[in-house]
Each structure stands twice: as structure tokens, then as C-alpha cells.
């Protein structure tokens, strides 16, 4: 469950972003981080995940004074949900498919892609593995507790939310059983950058 490197600056940065925006930002499909400056602020799932990851990776680079994460890897995260999963999985050589996802294999800062039905908009934009939603696992710097942060457009409390990981996994059990969940570890990009 734990990553081999602590990534404290990354962890703290993601947590600060989550604390700042959870419950205060709505959801709008196709809107990335620029939507945070709108009134009211909005962002979609891939925009939120990209913001969390790139800000965390930049913070880790600054804290260490070196390129722990490459600019090319961070740039590749500016994509749709399926492409983010594809890029991280391809670049790290690590992707867990539903049946291989367990407490023992789950990365500390997992990025999770889900196939959430067959939305009409996806007909014109085919998705790798059918992934139409993405979420990011973040950890509380105080106690290490894992949470899922996501921007979601559902009918209940749309926008950025924060859910304890165990609760989120229980709510997502049907996706896991149906083989509609994929997990990657974006922080494995660090070992790639360091050669």
C-alpha cells in the first residue's frame, strides 16, 4: 500500500488543494483547471485529477531541488480520463485491472479509472477500456488516512468531493466486480525520471 518514497511535499500539496476546493467547486464536463476561476467555479474529473497530480509533482520537484518528475510526464497528464490512465500505465509499466486490485496491490496515491456506463457523448469520442471517469487517492498528512477525491457530475452533490477510500471502494464494488476499474500509480513516474 505504501510507495517506496515518501513524497511528503506532493502529499501535502494534494491535501491543501482538496481542503481548498472540496464542496466549493461544481462539475462541468470538458472544463479543466481554468474553470476554477469562473463564477461559480467548475471542473471535470480529468481536469481535477490533472491539477492534483501536476501540482503535487511540481511541489515534489521544488522540495527536492531536482526533476523527480519530468516535464514531459506532467504534460502527458493534461488529457481525458482514459488517456491519463493509459499514459501513466504505459510510462510506468504498471496497471492493475479490476480482478488484481486488492489491499496489498493498491498504491498509496492511486489514480483510478472507471467505466461508468455508456454515456451518449462517448459515442463520438471512443475511450480506451471504455473509461469515462477518473479519481485520485489523496492522503491526510496528519494520520496517513487515504481518501478519494473526485469531481463528479452525478445528481447528488455534483462537484469536488472527498470520501474515505474504504467507503468509496465499497460504493464502487459493482465496477470492481464487473471488471470496469483500473488502477495506476502516478508516483512510479518518479523512478522513471531518475533513470
Residue ranges and their predicted role:
Residues 65-158:
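...with weaker cross-activation on analogous glycine-rich loops/strands in unrelated enzymes
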Residues 27-29, 156-159:
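Short, solvent-exposed loop/turn elements at domain surfaces
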Residues 23, 91-93, 167:
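N-terminal compositionally biased, intrinsically disordered segments and leader/signal-like regions
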Residues 151, 163-195:
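Low-complexity, Gly/Ser/Thr/Pro-rich intrinsically disordered linker/tail segments
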Residues 15, 145, 157, 178-181:
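Low-complexity, intrinsically disordered short peptide segments enriched in small/polar/basic residues
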Residues 1-78:
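N-terminal capping segments
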